[in-house]
């Protein structure tokens, strides 16, 4: 709604590339063993992480891990009624029984300004309906995702609103699904068991904004709207907590430089 409002008021926006996909969960013990070795004392090393990338065979797309949460949990993060999106987090000790991470596919910037946002919203609406319209998340084992069939019974998940079996191919973007499938096959070669022990919980749509409010890189002010300073994730200049905070520090330092009364 904010993007539409800004556009109606004449604020300059532009389409940008972003990424969408799913969240995957695995037993943390599997990730620990594959990444650190059998018998390692996790109390000394901490829970293991992974960073994975794979290019599709035709080299037109890719899949990669993002925001991996060792010993973490999955959480809902819908921002509109009738939509569903997931995210992941780890508590400070990172000692939960499950690891989760986003596995996402690049979405190129579109020629039409709101095409990326429209696709994002459609996937979130489809997910809400596939989950039973009660904010339960549609889920599928990676093994059955590759076979394009629903599960009868799902393994445990940390997602707080519960999960329901769903064939993701029936409601997610087919290009995203195809790239994810190739990615999973590649990742299983790097982390054996990634397919057999993996559960998909969908969707992960909020890696970054599909739109950017254009700004002057030096002043951080909108290019055509005086007094509007844009920063952080929603404005299209960050992809997470730390990068958003860093963008805020830039603006604070600039304001302090121009106004000597700021302590």
What are these regions (language model features)?
Residues 1-263:
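Residues forming the flavin
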């Amino acid at each position: 709604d904010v993007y539409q409002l800004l556009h109606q008021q004449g604020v300059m926006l532009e389409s940008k590339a972003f990424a969408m996909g799913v969240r995957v969960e695995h037993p943390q013990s599997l990730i620990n063993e594959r990444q650190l070795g059998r018998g390692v004392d996790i109390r000394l090393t901490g829970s293991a992480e992974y960073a994975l990338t794979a290019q599709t065979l035709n080299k037109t797309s890719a899949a990669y891990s993002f925001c991996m949460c060792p010993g973490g949990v999955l959480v809902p993060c819908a921002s509109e009624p009738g939509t569903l999106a997931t995210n992941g987090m780890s508590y400070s000790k990172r000692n939960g029984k499950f690891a989760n991470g986003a596995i996402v596919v690049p979405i190129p910037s579109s020629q039409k300004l709101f095409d990326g946002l429209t696709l994002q919203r459609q996937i979130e609406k489809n997910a809400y309906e596939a989950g039973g319209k009660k904010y339960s998340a549609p889920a599928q084992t990676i093994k059955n995702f590759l076979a394009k069939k629903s599960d009868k019974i799902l393994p445990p998940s940390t997602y707080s609103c519960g999960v329901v079996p769903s064939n993701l191919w029936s409601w997610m973007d087919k290009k995203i699904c195809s790239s994810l499938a190739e990615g999973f096959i590649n990742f299983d070669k790097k982390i054996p068991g990634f397919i057999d022990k993996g559960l998909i919980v969908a969707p992960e749509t909020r890696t970054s904004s599909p739109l950017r409010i254009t700004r002057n890189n030096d002043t951080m002010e909108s290019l055509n709207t005086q007094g509007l300073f844009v920063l952080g994730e929603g404005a299209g200049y960050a992809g997470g907590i730390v990068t958003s905070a860093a963008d805020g520090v830039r603006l604070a330092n600039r304001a302090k430089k121009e106004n000597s009364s700021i302590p």
